[in-house]
Regions:
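His/Asp/Glu-enriched short active-site or ligand-binding loop at hydrolase and phosphoryl-transfer sites
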Residues: 162-174
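Extended substrate/RNA-proximal surfaces in nucleic-acid metabolism proteins
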Residues: 2-15, 59-163
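Catalytic phosphate/metal-binding cores of nucleic-acid and nucleotide-processing enzymes, i.e., regions
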Residues: 1-2, 9, 13-17, 29, ...
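Histidine-centered divalent metal-coordination motifs
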Residues: 24-26, 56-57, 141, 202-204
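Short acidic/histidine-rich active-site segments
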Residues: 194-208
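Generic structural signal for hydrophobic
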Residues: 39-46, 130, 157
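Histidine/acidic-residue-rich catalytic or RNA/ligand-binding cores of hydrolases
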Residues: 31-33, 63, 83-87, 148-154, ...
């Protein structure tokens, strides 16, 4: 876990703003339009320093496409109390036993996956399993969460072991509504709780 934590901690705001790093990408293994292989090739062609393919609830893309430059990642659907959220896991051991119960049973992580509506994933158990698998746990696009108090919401997750928060995210592009928090307020919360700041385009298209 420490290697990936230090690597991602070293990524700067400038890296994200210049498009040199993209830690939130989806392929056809979930609801993206591009193949896993095409995304890897595009990332290389664009000269990305680091990139992660983070399909919903599945690592099948990483299993079937080993030995690429992509950081292993997943975007999990999970509940915390009354709040439905997405947790990004980075740098996980693909063979870790504790993680297996959290993956979708469907090969494509979003296809006919009832868990996306009535998720049985528990945020505390998931974060613990991510750490057991050598990974780091990051709250995705927090401004989309129905949290009346974002500070308390994040504090709860930090007490469970949350490592980071997705600060750099194209809300106008992908999310029609920002719920109760602004992107600027999220960065302040990240600083308050000493969280790793990550970011990505949440790409679902054929082109990065």
């Amino acid at each position: 876990m420490e290697n990936y934590k230090e690597l991602i901690k070293g990524i700067t705001r400038e890296d994200f703003e210049k498009g040199l790093v993209n830690l939130h990408i989806h392929s056809r293994y979930s609801d993206g339009k591009a193949t896993f292989k095409d995304l890897v090739e595009q990332a290389k062609a664009k000269g990305l320093k680091y990139f992660a393919i983070t399909d919903h609830n599945t690592i099948q893309g990483h299993i079937e496409n080993p030995n690429t430059d992509a950081i292993s990642g997943v975007e999990f659907d999970v509940w915390h109390k009354y709040i439905f959220l997405h947790l990004l896991a980075y740098g996980i051991d693909l063979n870790n036993e504790k993680m297996k119960k959290f993956y979708s049973k469907d090969k494509r992580g979003t296809e006919a996956d009832i868990v996306r509506i009535f998720s049985q994933r528990n945020s505390k158990e998931l974060i613990e399993a991510i750490h057991d698998a050598g990974g780091i746990a990051v709250l995705a696009h927090p401004c989309c969460c129905w949290a009346l108090s974002m500070d308390k919401f994040v504090k709860d997750l930090v007490e469970m072991g949350l490592d980071g928060i997705e600060v750099f995210y194209p809300y106008p592009r992908w999310r029609k509504y920002i719920k109760f928090s602004s992107p600027d307020s999220i960065e302040k919360i990240a600083d308050k709780y000493h969280l790793i700041k990550t970011g990505g385009t949440d790409c679902h298209e054929e082109k990065l």
